[in-house]
């Protein structure tokens, strides 16, 4: 898969023409009515620049990206998040993120204070779910490493832990013991600092909808989708790795690294192929989801079967 600078892509190349024109019309009108349904402000169209990384594959239709979701906090069925968010997860402002652990500048920042110092970038990434389906999503976000550096992680900061909002009133899926809430994920510090890792605040040029992890989520395109934690409220620098949510729930099936690897099957299904949403035939899964040239060196010398 060719990964090229987004500066080499025109927006009309990335999105089918009708959708591209609809999006332009949508933003021009302010989209007040549609955004009101999601609890987002009318100005939710985002000012962005083209970031340095994008795939040249056509994106998955926006309707599929916003209605076919894994977000167990809102329900375990793919349709639950989009169906339940308008009744429960109706407000994603105000929002704050607490920074703690092995860093010189811990604290709690509001969403705007966390995001405003940075330039929002458009990045078109492949997303591979551990369930053997995939999408291509045009994200809007900020390089994760740029954000983390502001808090000056110390020499003991070997890992970064992320935590999702825990609020069963807004996230009714948390009323069931599907996993040990809140949802927790983690990365090695070098993974978190890699320029592909993204803190996303939007998709298709608009703010994230609640079912997609509003208002701020992680996107790590070379890992299975469950690593890209949604609705983040805490970031902690740590000396040791976290025992993440799915590691606690099913340690034989879900490891800490969760790198996309067609040579290492899930205990219950093959990872050698995937179903791209919107396509009939399966396609071969690529090592590191097609980002091997960028990230394989992070795992030099590691046994990727043992460190799954």
Swiss-Prot record:
Keyword GTP-binding: no
This protein's record includes keyword rRNA-binding: no
UniProt subcellular location: Periplasm
Cofactor note: Binds 1 Mo-molybdopterin (Mo-MPT) cofactor per subunit.
Enzyme Commission number(s) from the entry: 1.8.5.-
Superkingdom in the source lineage: Bacteria
Catalyzed chemical reaction(s): L-methionyl-[protein] + a quinone + H2O = L-methionyl-(S)-S-oxide-[protein] + a quinol; L-methionyl-[protein] + a quinone + H2O = L-methionyl-(R)-S-oxide-[protein] + a quinol
Residues annotated for Mo-molybdopterin binding in this entry: 69, 72-73, 129, 164, 212, 217, 228-230
Cofactor(s) it depends on: Mo-molybdopterin
PTMs per UniProt: Predicted to be exported by the Tat system. The position of the signal peptide cleavage has not been experimentally proven.
Key words of the record: Metal-binding, Molybdenum, Oxidoreductase, Periplasm, Signal
GO cellular component, one term: periplasmic space
Main localization of the protein described in the UniProt heading: periplasm
UniProt signal peptide: 1-44
GO molecular function, one term: molybdopterin cofactor binding
Protein's GO biological process: protein repair
Oligomeric and partner information: Heterodimer of a catalytic subunit (MsrP) and a heme-binding subunit (MsrQ).
Summary of the function given for this chain in its UniProt record: Part of the MsrPQ system that repairs oxidized periplasmic proteins containing methionine sulfoxide residues (Met-O), using respiratory chain electrons. Thus protects these proteins from oxidative-stress damage caused by reactive species of oxygen and chlorine generated by the host defense mechanisms. MsrPQ is essential for the maintenance of envelope integrity under bleach stress, rescuing a wide series of structurally unrelated periplasmic proteins from methionine oxidation.
PANTHER family: PROTEIN-METHIONINE-SULFOXIDE REDUCTASE (PTHR43032), PROTEIN-METHIONINE-SULFOXIDE REDUCTASE CATALYTIC SUBUNIT MSRP (PTHR43032:SF3)
Family: Belongs to the MsrP family.
Protein name: Protein-methionine-sulfoxide reductase catalytic subunit MsrP
Organism field: Paramagnetospirillum magneticum (strain ATCC 700264 / AMB-1) (Magnetospirillum magneticum)
Gene: msrP
